[in-house]
UniProtKB/Swiss-Prot annotation:
Residues 1-22 form the signal peptide. Pfam families: Conotoxin (PF02950). It is found in: Secreted. It comes from Conus victoriae (Queen Victoria cone). This is Conotoxin Vc6a. Residues 23-49 form a propeptide.
Length: 75
């Protein structure tokens, strides 16, 4: 019985804390995830960059080859 009361109080506390720390309590956490997605800079992500395959011409100072840049060609 005591454990059940403690669990109920803990769940109520965590729920109240979640809504109190959210920017917009009407939308809860859903709104936070949407804002975080729009605040990201997709151009800054290195995952969006395409690497050059073997045989393509590469830049010596800033190579974007999948492996290595040797004599201005990707290996």
């Amino acid at each position: 019985m005591k454990l059940t009361c403690v669990v109920i109080v803990a769940v109520l506390f965590l729920t109240a804390n979640t809504f109190a720390t959210a920017d917009d309590p009407r939308n809860g956490l859903e709104n936070l995830f949407l804002k975080a997605h729009h605040e990201m800079n997709p151009e800054a992500s290195k995952l969006n960059e395409r690497c050059l395959s073997g045989g393509e011409v590469c830049d010596f100072l800033f190579p974007k080859c999948c492996n290595y840049c040797i004599l201005l060609f990707c290996s």
